[in-house]
């Protein structure tokens, strides 16, 4: 971690920078007392471990008695940490000021949360191990659109933009997504976003997150969105989510399929596992057809957990075709789930 104390350009501030070479995180702490300007680099894990164990509200003092030592004092505690010259810390010098745009933190968090569970864990297909961010246009309206898929399920969500933006499509890595989500959960306001060919920058007031991007081409996800699913299944969300979760409890492997036996206005869900037993639940639904189809229970729970309204709509075609899932309370998000065999 790199620490810079300044009383000039950024008055009375401590700037902390950390990196793992894939991510760079910069945080400015204001209203600190700078007696003398300075900068150094030390171990982030050791410093974090010390600071988190100091009583809340206690004053902490830093000093640099020599180029190789950083002294940390608080009440009756004194620590001397090994450090190296700040000039050896790897910093990025790219110009991110081009093509900058802003989006509200809650909108950005929505896009991430509604897509991140569909990210692939298959390292051999690195282009699927993140979220694809790009600008789309519907009629004369511009959107920032996010998409993620592991080839068994897919999430797509979009947010309306005030104006068309200059933004090259990017694939944001999984590690970056989860780090960004943790920052957004504690922040409310506009997030400035800018990118160059291989990196992207997010600015949240006093915090900056810079990330490498995934080098690859995201597949044409539009062509796999079902367009002929005319059999509409309408269910109350909470009872559906609870029922799937309960029935799936029978299975030792959560990847076991939950079988849907659909008749007019009735859904029978069942799980049968030779090692642990079986379970069945019935729900009253709106449905005018007959159809048997099976799904991975985890996929259904992941989608249902992200819906905003009180209903879930599942559009079906036949036993072997993917299902299209919509949230009546959010027309800007869709989900596609492949069925399981048997």
Question: How does the language model describe each region?
Answer:
Residues 210-213, 217, 323-342:
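A short, hydrophobic, proline-anchored segment that marks a local hinge/packing element in signaling
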Residues 1-5, 9-10:
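Single conserved hydrophobic/aromatic residue that forms the stacking wall/gate
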Residues 23-60, 94, 119-129, 153-194, ...:
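A cross-kingdom feature marking solvent-exposed beta-strand/loop segments within repeated
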Residues 63, 67-168:
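Intrinsically disordered, low-complexity linker/loop segments enriched in Gly/Pro
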Residues 14-16, 47, 108, 112, ...:
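Short, structured motif recognition centered on aromatic/hydrophobic residues
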Residues 7, 15, 59-61, 130-134, ...:
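Short, surface-exposed charged micro-motifs
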Residues 90-109, 207, 212-236:
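Surface-exposed beta-loop interaction hotspot
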Residues 10-25:
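N-terminal glycine-rich anion-binding loops that anchor highly charged ligand groups
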């Amino acid at each position: 971690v790199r620490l810079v104390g300044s009383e000039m350009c950024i008055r009375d501030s401590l700037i902390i920078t950390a990196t793992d070479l894939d991510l760079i995180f910069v945080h400015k702490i204001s209203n600190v007392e700078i007696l003398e300007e300075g900068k150094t680099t030390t171990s982030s894990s050791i410093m974090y471990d010390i600071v988190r164990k100091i009583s809340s509200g206690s004053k902490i003092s830093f000093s640099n008695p020599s180029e190789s030592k950083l002294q940390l004092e608080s009440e009756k505690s004194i620590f001397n940490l090994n450090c190296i010259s700040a000039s050896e810390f790897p910093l990025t010098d790219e110009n991110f000021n081009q093509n900058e745009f802003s989006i509200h933190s809650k909108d950005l968090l929505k896009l991430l949360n509604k897509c991140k569970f569909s990210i692939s864990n298959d390292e051999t297909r690195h282009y699927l191990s993140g979220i694809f961010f790009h600008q789309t246009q519907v009629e004369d309206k511009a959107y920032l659109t996010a998409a993620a898929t592991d080839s068994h399920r897919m999430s797509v969500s979009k947010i309306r933009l005030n104006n068309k933006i200059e933004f090259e499509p990017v694939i944001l890595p999984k590690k970056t997504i989860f780090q960004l989500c943790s920052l957004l959960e504690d922040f409310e306001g506009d997030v400035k976003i800018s990118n160059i060919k291989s990196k992207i920058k997010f600015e949240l007031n006093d915090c900056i997150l810079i990330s490498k991007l995934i080098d690859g081409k995201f597949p044409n996800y539009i062509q796999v969105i079902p367009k002929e699913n005319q059999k509409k299944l309408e269910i109350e969300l909470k009872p559906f989510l609870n029922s799937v979760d309960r029935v799936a409890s029978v299975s030792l492997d959560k990847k076991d399929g939950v079988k849907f036996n659909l008749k007019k206005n009735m859904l029978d869900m069942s799980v049968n596992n030779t090692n642990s037993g079986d379970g069945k639940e019935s729900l009253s639904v709106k449905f005018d057809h007959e159809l048997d189809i099976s799904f991975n229970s985890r996929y259904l729970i992941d989608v249902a957990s992200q819906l905003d309204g009180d209903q879930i709509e599942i559009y079906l075609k036949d036993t072997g075709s993917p299902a299209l899932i919509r949230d009546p309370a959010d027309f800007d998000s869709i989900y596609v789930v492949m069925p399981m065999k048997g």
